[in-house]
Amino acid sequence: MTAQNIDGTLISQTVRSEVAARVKARVAAGLRAPGLAVVLVGEDPASQVYVGSKRRACEEVGFVSKSFDLPASTSEEELLALIDELNNDAEIDGILVQLPLPAGIDSTHVLESIHPEKDVDGFHPYNVGRLAQRIPKLRSCTPKGIITLLERYNIALRGKHAVIVGASNIVGRPMTLELLLAGCTTTTCHRFTKDLEGHVRQADVLVVAVGKPNFIPGEWVKEGAIVVDVGINRLESGKLIGDVEYNKARERASFITPVPGGVGPMTVASLIENTMLACEQYHTK
């Protein structure tokens, strides 16, 4: 068996086109375009790249993108004051604070200060709690994007055993909640998990998000499994690879996300969808 690649680049473009059409219809009806505020603190090169891609995506679909680039010396109080201002700005539907934040700033405190109805990253405890209660609104972008990918490929999830490797607040934990909501039986593995191989070998759906190149050997993948590789690791050669040994895993899986071009593009597409949703459901007067 050779797995079919799940094309995140293609699906993300489709999602963006759908959102662009909704924006066009709003503006034609005399309503304002959705607004996203993107806050970057400091000059971390990777963060600058990510923020740039998010801003471009916003502009492509017709959003109003407002940029706030703050120096690394910014205090937590100054950042919280800006967020408070944006929370009260009627033309801003979403607030995105790029992580990581410089040392000395409590990221949990900052993320919790964003109004839940403008939390388009889906990190606020209120929004994670809604997902846990099976009434999601603004969902964490990467897990939401993964579910969108699987849905667009008509991959049925109900009744499958899903194994999530990695338990971060950004991917692993909300991914577990998403797959529970989709009707999977879920196992979440982390640094204290015993017999990781045994768990992985049982997975009908395998989601790996640990940030370690080729962490999961391809031979561990169950025949016919659906493999979602969230990892993006740059080797010294400059090549990007995932957390799963792709070539060997592809020989055993039925579907697999490549790196790059799999999950990555969907994170930004989900951010765009969330901003549209926030505008339509919460802020349209």
Curated annotation (Swiss-Prot):
Belongs to the tetrahydrofolate dehydrogenase/cyclohydrolase family. This is Bifunctional protein FolD. SUPFAM superfamilies: Aminoacid dehydrogenase-like, N-terminal domain, NAD(P)-binding Rossmann-fold domains. The lineage of its organism: Bacteria, Pseudomonadati, Pseudomonadota, Gammaproteobacteria, Vibrionales. It catalyses: (6R)-5,10-methylene-5,6,7,8-tetrahydrofolate + NADP(+) = (6R)-5,10-methenyltetrahydrofolate + NADPH; (6R)-5,10-methenyltetrahydrofolate + H2O = (6R)-10-formyltetrahydrofolate + H(+). It holds the Pfam family THF_DHG_CYH_C. Keywords: Amino-acid biosynthesis, Histidine biosynthesis, Hydrolase, Methionine biosynthesis, Multifunctional enzyme, NADP, One-carbon metabolism, Oxidoreductase, Purine biosynthesis. Pathway: One-carbon metabolism; tetrahydrofolate interconversion. The keyword Transmembrane does not apply. CDD domains: NAD_bind_m-THF_DH_Cyclohyd. Homodimer. Its EC number is 1.5.1.5, 3.5.4.9. GO terms for cellular component: cytosol. One of its GO terms (molecular function) is methenyltetrahydrofolate cyclohydrolase activity. NADP(+) binds at G166, A167, S168, I232. InterPro entries: Aminoacid_DH-like_N_sf (IPR046346), NAD(P)-bd_dom_sf (IPR036291), THF_DH/CycHdrlase (IPR000672), THF_DH/CycHdrlase_cat_dom (IPR020630), THF_DH/CycHdrlase_CS (IPR020867), THF_DH/CycHdrlase_NAD-bd_dom (IPR020631). It comes from Vibrio vulnificus (strain YJ016).
